[in-house]
């Protein structure tokens, strides 16, 4: 039986996701698989490629032939170089950036909400500012009157 390592398409119309599978070469693209070796998501940035290297090495060792798209993926992950004994077995796969947890995102949004604008009316702040200015003016007037009273008492003596 001729065995191929190929892609099985999943996903919606414009959002394809693929499984990397081992299947009989005569089965259709989305037919029955012998084994699932990994996934490939081309729409993510950078593309997500997760392939079980040990199982790929096994299937290549027993004679499974990769299709052209799968061969390109195996070269990116370094599995093809490892199988052939070529240099560059580490591959050129880019690491996925770490996603922030939902709890961290929630806490950041909560902190922004606490520091952001409040639901209080703006006019109350204006009134409070006027009131503070009036109180400061009243304190200054009292201080001036006290200074004048002291000056009068000293001059009367």
UniProtKB/Swiss-Prot annotation:
* One protein family per Pfam: Ribosomal_S16
**InterPro entries referenced in this protein's UniProt entry, alphabetically:** Ribosomal_bS16, Ribosomal_bS16_dom_sf
Q: Where is the composition biased (Acidic residues)?
A: 142-157
Question: Could you tell me which residues belong to the region Disordered?
Answer: 125-157
- Keywords for this protein: Ribonucleoprotein, Ribosomal protein
UniProt lists compositionally biased (Basic and acidic residues) regions at: 125-141
Record-level GO BP terms: translation
**Gene Ontology CC:** cytoplasm; small ribosomal subunit
GO MF: structural constituent of ribosome
- Keyword check for Hydrolase, yes or no: no
Q: Which family does it belong to?
A: Belongs to the bacterial ribosomal protein bS16 family.
Which NCBIfam families does this one have? PRK14520.1, S16
For this entry, the protein name equals Small ribosomal subunit protein bS16
Gene name linked to the record: rpsP
């Amino acid at each position: 039986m001729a065995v191929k390592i190929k892609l099985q398409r999943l996903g919606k119309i414009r959002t394809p996701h693929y499984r990397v599978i081992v299947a009989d070469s005569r089965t259709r693209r989305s037919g029955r698989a012998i084994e699932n070796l990994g996934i490939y998501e081309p729409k993510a940035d950078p593309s997500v490629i997760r392939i079980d290297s040990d199982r790929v090495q096994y299937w290549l060792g027993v004679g499974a032939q990769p299709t052209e798209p799968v061969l390109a993926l195996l070269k990116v992950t370094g599995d093809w170089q490892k199988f052939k004994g070529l240099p560059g077995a580490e591959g050129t796969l880019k690491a996925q950036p770490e996603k922030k947890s939902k709890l961290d995102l929630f806490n950041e949004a909560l902190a922004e909400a606490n520091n952001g604008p409040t639901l209080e009316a703006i006019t109350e702040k204006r009134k409070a500012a006027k009131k503070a200015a009036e109180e400061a003016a009243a304190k200054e007037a009292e201080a001036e009157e006290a200074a004048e009273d002291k000056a009068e008492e000293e001059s009367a003596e």
